[in-house]
């Protein structure tokens, strides 16, 4: 039997999850790897069954409790992201805080002294998914370069990203129209890769980027 590296990885996760479930039945508290295996295996299996994304996320957050795991595991497992195969393709499933904790320190931040960068001006754009498949866009993806099946005023999105928490995403269902808020990309303001429309500084490549977008059917 020939298995791809991805299929081998899924089998390893499945077996690790089975071992973890046995230990849980014995009353043993799960460590980080065991808890992660159970959650990831659940996500992969439910995706294979065609369960809706929101139902998978909800179910993953109800699998384990603070009493099932060793001390500190809920704080370590604050975010789980899995590329799962659904009947209509591969999608990124993001589960935040899958194990609820009673500790007040969970998801709190200690802010160091110094200057804090406040997010700048935001814009709103109406986006329509004209494709036949769902499209998910991550928090820090250069919105100007998103899937060409998303129709909107692309030029206004140049140098912008979704104004949502880091690590999260917005999902556009086929035929759906949705209004989103965008903010300027910070930091060094350089974009490379993605769909290859910018390839460099956002400050100096705008005209060339817009030209590429039109030539390649993005705008």
Curated annotation (Swiss-Prot):
Segments of this protein annotated with the region Urease beta: 102-219
Keyword Aminoacyl-tRNA synthetase: no
Pfam families, per the entry: Urease_beta, Urease_gamma
Pathway: Nitrogen metabolism; urea degradation; CO(2) and NH(3) from urea (urease route): step 1/1
Key words, A-Z: Cytoplasm, Hydrolase
Primary localisation category: cytoplasm
EC category name: hydrolase
Domain of life: Archaea
Annotated stretches, region: Urease gamma: 1-101
Any one GO biological process: urea catabolic process
Disulfide bond as UniProt keyword: no
Gene Ontology terms for molecular function: nickel cation binding; urease activity
UniProt xrefs under SUPFAM superfamilies: Urease, beta-subunit, Urease, gamma-subunit
Compartment(s) where it occurs, according to its Swiss-Prot or TrEMBL record: Cytoplasm
Catalysis: reaction(s): urea + 2 H2O + H(+) = hydrogencarbonate + 2 NH4(+)
Gene3D superfamilies reported for this sequence: Urease, beta subunit (2.10.150.10), Urease, gamma-like subunit (3.30.280.10)
Record-listed E.C. numbers: 3.5.1.5
This protein's GO CC annotations: urease complex
InterPro entries referenced in this protein's UniProt entry, alphabetically: Urease_beta-like, Urease_betasu_sf, Urease_gamma-beta_su, Urease_gamma/gamma-beta_su, Urease_gamma_sf, Urease_subunit
Family statement drawn from the similarity comment of this UniProt entry: In the N-terminal section; belongs to the urease gamma subunit family.
Quaternary assembly: Heterohexamer of 3 UreC (alpha) and 3 UreAB (gamma/beta) subunits.
PANTHER family xrefs: UREASE
HAMAP family: Urease_beta_gamma
Protein's name in the database: Urease subunit gamma/beta
Native source organism of the sequence: Sulfurisphaera tokodaii (strain DSM 16993 / JCM 10545 / NBRC 100140 / 7)
């Amino acid at each position: 039997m020939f298995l791809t590296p991805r299929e081998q990885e899924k089998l390893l996760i499945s077996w690790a999850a089975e071992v973890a479930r046995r230990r849980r039945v014995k009353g043993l508290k799960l460590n980080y790897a065991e808890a992660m295996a159970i959650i990831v295996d659940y996500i992969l299996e439910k995706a294979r069954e065609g369960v809706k994304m929101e139902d998978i996320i909800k179910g993953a957050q109800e699998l384990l409790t603070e009493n099932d795991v060793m001390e500190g595991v809920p704080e370590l497992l604050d975010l789980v992201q899995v590329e799962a195969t659904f009947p209509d393709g591969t999608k990124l499933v993001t589960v935040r805080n899958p194990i609820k904790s009673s500790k007040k320190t969970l998801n709190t931040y200690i802010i160091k002294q110094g200057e804090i960068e406040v997010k700048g001006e935001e814009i709103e754009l109406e986006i329509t998914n004209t494709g036949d498949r769902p499209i998910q866009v991550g928090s820090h993806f250069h919105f100007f370069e998103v899937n060409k099946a998303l129709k909107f005023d692309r030029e206004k999105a140049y140098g912008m990203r979704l104004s949502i928490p880091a690590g999260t995403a917005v999902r556009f269902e086929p035929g759906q129209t949705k209004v989103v808020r965008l903010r300027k990309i910070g930091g060094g303001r350089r974009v490379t890769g993605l769909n290859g429309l910018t390839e460099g500084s956002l400050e100096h490549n705008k005209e060339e980027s817009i030209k590429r977008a039109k030539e390649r059917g993005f705008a």
